[in-house]
A protein has these predicted regions:
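Intrinsic structural disorder
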Residues: 1, 27-28
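Bacterial N-terminal signal peptides that target proteins for export
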Residues: 1-11
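C-terminal segment of classical bacterial N-terminal signal peptides
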Residues: 17-25
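All-alpha RGS (Regulator of G-protein Signaling) helical domain and cognate RGS-like helical scaffolds
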Residues: 28-170
């Protein structure tokens, strides 16, 4: 009886180890240098979405933009938490609305706010563009091994962006 219990316990431990710990063995314990740069870009990309939506909430007046801008702030906070965990610089901390460290995002902000200012439908189309951009970037990042906290944050952002895309597409 004792031998059977011990054998069952050993087999159970082996199965748990093989199934439960195998994914952790492949997960990175710290973001790579490339992932660090991607996170820093991503937090600014989320700021771009938030700032464009805040601009439209004021100038185009649709409740969707105000609601989704709040969600984008949550996305920024989530990525800011990951950056803080690894003591990485957050490029959005001292930036005013519509001001970006990344020059490409700065140009994109100017172009998108102008493009979406013509009417509500143009603004919604800009929302679709932004969310498609976010989704593509997030899917590319999620293809790589990464720390669990980073994967969790990116998965949440991806789900949020999919929901935002659906809201702007209605």
């Amino acid at each position: 009886m004792r031998i059977k219990r011990k054998l069952t316990a050993i087999v159970a431990m082996a199965i748990i180890g093989a199934v439960g710990l195998a994914p952790m063995a492949n997960a990175a314990t710290r973001p790579t240098t490339a992932q660090k740069l991607q996170l820093q870009y991503l937090v600014e990309e989320e700021k771009l979405a938030r700032d464009v939506y805040l601009y439209f909430a004021t100038n185009v007046t649709s409740y969707k933009f105000a609601n989704i801008a709040r969600s984008e702030q949550t996305h920024m906070d989530l990525i800011a938490g990951v950056l803080k965990t690894y003591n990485y610089f957050n490029p959005t901390l001292t930036r005013a609305q519509g001001v970006f460290r990344d020059k490409t995002l700065q140009s994109l902000y100017t172009a998108l706010t102008a493009k979406g200012s013509t009417d509500i439908w143009a603004a919604y189309q800009v929302g679709v563009e932004i969310e498609n951009l976010d989704i593509g970037d997030l899917q590319n990042m999620l293809d790589d091994a990464m720390p669990a906290d980073m994967k969790y944050a990116l998965d949440r952002l991806l789900n949020g962006s999919i929901n935002h895309l659906a809201a702007f597409s209605r």
